[in-house]
């Protein structure tokens, strides 16, 4: 039986490699959301974003040139 969804059965590191340079949304365990351009991600899920924005309770809180997020704080990464 074939997978109907292209994301099923994919290696997460391959997906992350494909979206380098793309706009992403990163949600933290605390509920804070960052949106920006993915510059790098490592094996520990540490993330570097460029032109990033921080959203708290759905409202823009701050804009950053660069943001570095420690991997153990990441709930998920979503390509926009």
UniProtKB/Swiss-Prot annotation:
InterPro entries linked: Lsm6/sSmF, LSM_dom_sf, Sm, Sm_dom_euk/arc
Cellular component annotations (GO), alphabetically ordered: nucleolus; P-body; sno(s)RNA-containing ribonucleoprotein complex; spliceosomal complex; U4/U6 x U5 tri-snRNP complex; U6 snRNP
GO terms for biological process, alphabetical: maturation of SSU-rRNA; mRNA splicing, via spliceosome; tRNA processing
Disulfide bonds: none
RNA-binding is among the record's keywords: yes
CDD domains the record matches: LSm6
Domain of life: Eukaryota
Record's keyword annotation contains RNA-binding: yes
Main location: cytoplasm
Domain Sm: 11-80
Subcellular localization, as worded in the UniProt entry: Cytoplasm; Nucleus
Record-linked Pfam families: LSM
Keywords: Cytoplasm, mRNA processing, mRNA splicing, Nucleus, Ribonucleoprotein, RNA-binding, rRNA processing, Spliceosome, tRNA processing
One Gene Ontology term of the molecular function aspect: RNA binding
Family from the record: Belongs to the snRNP Sm proteins family. SmF/LSm6 subfamily.
Oligomer and partners: Component of the heptameric LSM1-LSM7 complex, which consists of lsm1, lsm2, lsm3, lsm4, lsm5, lsm6 and lsm7. Component of the heptameric LSM2-LSM8 complex, which consists of lsm2, lsm3, lsm4, lsm5, lsm6, lsm7 and lsm8. The LSm subunits form a seven-membered ring structure with a doughnut shape.
Record's function text: Component of LSm protein complexes, which are involved in RNA processing and may function in a chaperone-like manner, facilitating the efficient association of RNA processing factors with their substrates. Component of the cytoplasmic LSM1-LSM7 complex, which is thought to be involved in mRNA degradation by activating the decapping step in the 5'-to-3' mRNA decay pathway. Component of the nuclear LSM2-LSM8 complex, which is involved in splicing of nuclear mRNAs.
Identification of the protein by name: U6 snRNA-associated Sm-like protein LSm6
Record lineage: Eukaryota, Fungi, Dikarya, Ascomycota, Pezizomycotina
